[in-house]
Amino acid sequence: MRGCTPISETTGTMSIDVIIGRDGKPRCAWAGAGDTAFGRYHDEVWGTPTSDESAMFEALTLGVFEVGLSWSIVFGKRDAFRKAFRGFHVAKVAAMTERDVDRLVQDASIIRNRGKIQATVDNARAMMSASPSLVALAKSNEITRKRAPRSVADLPKSTPQAEALAQQLKSQGYRFVGPTSVYAFMQNVGVVNDHVHGCFRATDYPTTARIR
């Protein structure tokens, strides 16, 4: 990518896993130069712990829609999803009717999959009634890393914690919550930090050199 320099902090050789952006910050390579929507998502959202209910619901929903598709497609429709699902306000989505679902199936700005749209409404209703809450369940399955993954190849598709959380969510009535999509949710909301070694947001990035 123009303006970005691939690096490897451990070997000094070229790597596709970390790049230096135009602002001088080392990032996971998928974030690009850091001056795009993807870069801002990497810097400000992905891997950042949150207890915000709407943020949790949004992350879970985007994971639902990602099933069978690429993340870039879903990511590019984030604003449309926010509009369609009422800012991911849980109570407002839980109150959506069959007529609302029918309307969203015709909305070309989002992914028009009736099953996933209905699952989003059902998941909002589960969030409204379930105990422990989604926030509490996610936190109870937190993964603490002393060292960052050495490369993207080291990132798992799922973990025992993701499998446990998926089972807990299914028991509460959540839908489209398999271990793989749940692990992606955990990465998104900072229950696990999977920024790779050398990225300025990685768990083992030198404290004295950490860039904020």
Residue ranges: model-predicted function:
Residues 4-212:
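HhH-family (HhH-GPD) DNA N-glycosylase catalytic core used in base-excision repair
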